[in-house]
Regions:
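Typically the conserved alpha-helix immediately C-terminal to a functionally engaged Cys/Sec
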Residues: 18-27
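A short beta-strand-loop structural module common to alpha/beta enzyme folds
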Residues: 33-43
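Short, glycine-/aromatic-enriched active-site segment of Class I SAM-dependent methyltransferases
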Residues: 46-53
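Conserved small/polar residues in nucleotide/adenosyl-binding loops
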Residues: 113-116
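Conserved N-terminal beta-strand and adjoining loop/helix that marks the start
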Residues: 94-98
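Local sequence-structure signature of Cys/Sec-based thiol-disulfide redox active-site neighborhoods
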Residues: 3-19
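Short, structured active-site "lid" loops
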Residues: 53-75
Length: 116
């Protein structure tokens, strides 16, 4: 029986970006199936803690600095550069609808964009 890993992703999430190549590299050395699970992180934030977006308008300096340091540490560890869009967070609803379409059609679109 093949083991399965559910991989939750939102194309606007820097954490998805950081982990994507890692899960694909892991699959090269381990036998498991990736179950792609598109989600809308913004929708989760809004339903669980709507203050997340409000706090971006008036960020706590120390929390923002730590968050940026944490992200920089992870980019260095992964050897990945993030080129942040001018507007962040972006609205990924349409792109994620496309992800659901490709899942319904059983097309692993995520694998089309890897260069390895």
């Amino acid at each position: 029986m093949t083991k399965k890993i559910e991989y939750f992703l939102d194309c606007s999430s820097p954490w998805t970006y950081l982990s994507f190549r890692g899960i694909l590299n892991l699959k090269k050395t381990k036998d498991f199936e990736i179950i792609w699970k598109p989600i809308l992180v913004g929708g989760i934030f809004n339903s669980i803690n709507p203050s997340v977006y409000e706090s971006r308008k008036n960020p706590v300096k120390e929390k923002l600095e730590y968050s940026q340091k944490d992200m920089n540490d992870w980019t260095k560890l992964r050897g990945i550069e993030i080129n942040w869009p001018k507007i962040f967070p972006i609205n990924s609803v349409r792109a994620m609808r496309g992800a659901f379409y490709f899942l319904d059609e059983q097309i692993e679109i995520c694998l089309l964009y890897t260069s390895d």
